[in-house]
Amino acid sequence: MARLTKRLKSIKDKVQPGKVYAIDDAFEVLKSVSSVKFVESVDVAVNLGVDPRKSDQAVRGATVLPHGTGKSVRVAVFAQGANAEAALAAGADIVGMDDLGAQVKAGELNFDVVIAAPDAMRVVGQLGQILGPRGLMPNPKTGTVTPDVATAVKNAKAGQVRYRTDKKGIIHCTIGKISFDSAALKENLEALLADLKKLKPSTAKGVYVKKITVSSTMGPGLAVDQSTLAA
């Protein structure tokens, strides 16, 4: 039988299989078993009571986390004229139109988020095969195709997260770093859940938020007692 590493043994000793954790306890367990040499992200998986086979039950949106994600985000904006100036003033890292499109086609994807003014979609529309598979294609539903590019840039820089249900009806999202205090992680999670509930499809039946699981990059997944959350 293979011997457990020290890290895995620590996880095995501190995590009770099948237990549903109060949210504060869940974060404290993740912190206690974190022993890697980098600052892990804290992620959440939310199982929703939707039928992922039905397009009208797909859940897609964006949430500005009150305490951000702990990540530095590079933002590219497709815009011109006054919109381009507003994007730069708001802190965008790269702004352009056809020139930025040429960079993307050349494989220069030096950004984490792409925002587009509506009149820039003639350029962005040609980049779907490049941006789409990377989750970077701007979309009105996530606020990344908008006439107010300045606000979109500020939101992205402030720690906005974008999400959509996968083939199993699950939302996956980062809610911060393991170095955040538990209260900040909890508030980020509650902000996400509040927005998810606003996005509930009218055709979804039964329990909407079925299960919440939090985990760290290299840590275990812990089921969360929803009654310990405000959202």
Swiss-Prot record:
Q: Which GO terms describe its biological process?
A: regulation of translation; translation
Q: Name one GO cellular component term.
A: cytosolic large ribosomal subunit
Q: Where is the signal peptide?
A: none
InterPro entries registered for this protein in UniProt: Ribosom_uL1_bac-type (IPR005878), Ribosomal_uL1 (IPR002143), Ribosomal_uL1-like (IPR023674), Ribosomal_uL1/biogenesis (IPR028364), Ribosomal_uL1_3-a/b-sand (IPR016095), Ribosomal_uL1_CS (IPR023673)
Instruction: Tell me the domain of life.
Output: Bacteria
Q: Which UniProt keywords apply?
A: Repressor, Ribonucleoprotein, Ribosomal protein, RNA-binding, rRNA-binding, Translation regulation, tRNA-binding
Q: Which GO terms describe its molecular function?
A: rRNA binding; structural constituent of ribosome; tRNA binding
Q: How does it assemble?
A: Part of the 50S ribosomal subunit.
HAMAP family, sorted: Ribosomal_uL1_B
State what this protein does.
Answer: Binds directly to 23S rRNA. The L1 stalk is quite mobile in the ribosome, and is involved in E site tRNA release. Protein L1 is also a translational repressor protein, it controls the translation of the L11 operon by binding to its mRNA.
The family note in this entry says: Belongs to the universal ribosomal protein uL1 family.
Tell me what this protein is called: Large ribosomal subunit protein uL1
Species assigned in the record: Methylococcus capsulatus (strain ATCC 33009 / NCIMB 11132 / Bath)
